[in-house]
Amino acid sequence: MIGLADCNNFYCSCERVFRPDLVGKPVVVLSNNDGCIIARSEEAKALGYKMGDPFYQVKEKLEAEGVAIFSSNYTLYGSLSNRVMSMLSHYSPHIDQYSIDESFFEVDYSMAKSFFETDHSMAERFFKEYPKENVTSATADSLLHQYGARISADVLQAVGLPISIGIAETKTLAKIGSKFAKKYKGYQGCCLIDTDERRRKALSLFPVEDVWGIGRQIARKLDYMGIRTAAQFADKKESWVRSHFNITTVRTWKELNGESCISIEELPQKKSICTSRSFADEGITDKNVIEEAVANFAVRCTEKLRRQGSVCQGITVFAWTSRFNESVPEYTIHDSLTLPIATNAQDEIVGAALTILRARYPKPMADSRPDRPGMSFNFKKAGVILWQISPDNPRQQDLFDPIDRSKQKALMEAIDAINRKNGYGTIRQAIQGTDCQFDLKREYMSKRFTTNINEILKVKTQ
């Protein structure tokens, strides 16, 4: 069986962990530069706020209705995500993190039975008083449900984040189960789809456009064909599905019918890695600051690259001015290069990114100030994309490579270890700067309670 643990309204729930006064109250989280709404609590959804609502359009309404507003605090979210994933690893030997707030895991009856017999839940390590289930006579299905419900309760107790768990024969069905567990409290945090009867009932109640793997275009095509529920799609013959859709959709159809086509390890590596940012206010006009920003984006990309055990050979850099401000000239930078040898070393990738940027950066305009060359262009967004990604081991070697790759790899591992322990940017390249002049506009950001000693939560006692 495959389980999926999905954190409920993750960003909003993270903000509530250190603000218990917000439990039961509407909360929204904003995108980079406080641009639009990207996360909503259930209470905020009930008030009618939508994903992507521009903040400037709903700001007054949010304030009038007493909605708690937060800027994105990715440091906090990443830290709490790591805690959840660490806890999940104690309940299953095979964990496959799908996103910051979702993770697949393997589960079976013997695993659940062994867990309850030893009764070694993570929550009990931190809390002396914790209810113990009597499962000596539990059937296989009820035991699996209790196991999932226990994981959900333990994570809430120890980390403070509510999670919903779906358990089924396939990843796609587990996804559907987690949606039901999130929507209906009667499931106690876990929905088990382990029989054909339960599968068919779940699919009959689930919109086909919400099925994992069914995109908007395919959903529109299915709707045109009169297929609105997952059950209607699953009931079609395989030959019909193959004649109308691609192999990916056929795999989704098989998964809905209980045939596992996506194993725990099979989720593909990213074909490209991108780090980009929109700049606040009027943008950036200083070439040195743009270079600093691009260097930081390149470093972030290399960290992601090393984290998934990959190397890349292609690099793209882009930057552009505002398309909506007619008072300043428009300019776009977008160029790529291919490295002779695939790498994940940040010094090589940062150097290549800066080479692209400097080659395409606009020359000073005739009417620009002599002491601030190139200041007539206000760049509103920039980013770095890594492509031609392949596994780090094995990697294609070059007989005449002047770099000692073993020493380079050891250096990158040391830098990553130090930065993980002491915080991002503890060791950085000089070109990255120290004052983040290109930093995001985050007027509503909460503190980094779990990673910054100066922002740790203080509790007053009498």
Model-derived features: where do they sit?
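Residues at or immediately flanking beta-strands
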Residues: 162-164, 316, 381-383
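Short, charged/polar surface micro-motifs in flexible loops or helix N-caps
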Residues: 10, 33-36, 322-325, 389-392
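Short Gly/Ser/Thr- and Asp/Glu-enriched loop/turn motifs at secondary-structure junctions
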Residues: 98-102, 168-171, 310-314, 377-381
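Short acidic/His/Gly/Ser-rich catalytic and metal-binding motifs that mark active-site loops
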Residues: 174, 325-329, 392-394
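Acidic, metal-coordinating catalytic segment for phosphate/diphosphate chemistry
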Residues: 338-462
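DNA-contacting surface of Y-family translesion DNA polymerases
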Residues: 210, 218-367, 371-376
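Gly/Gly-Pro- and Ser/Thr-rich, intrinsically disordered tail segments characteristic of DNA damage-repair
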Residues: 1-257, 264, 405-462
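Short acidic, glycine/proline-rich loop/turn micro-motifs
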Residues: 40-42, 329-335, 395-400
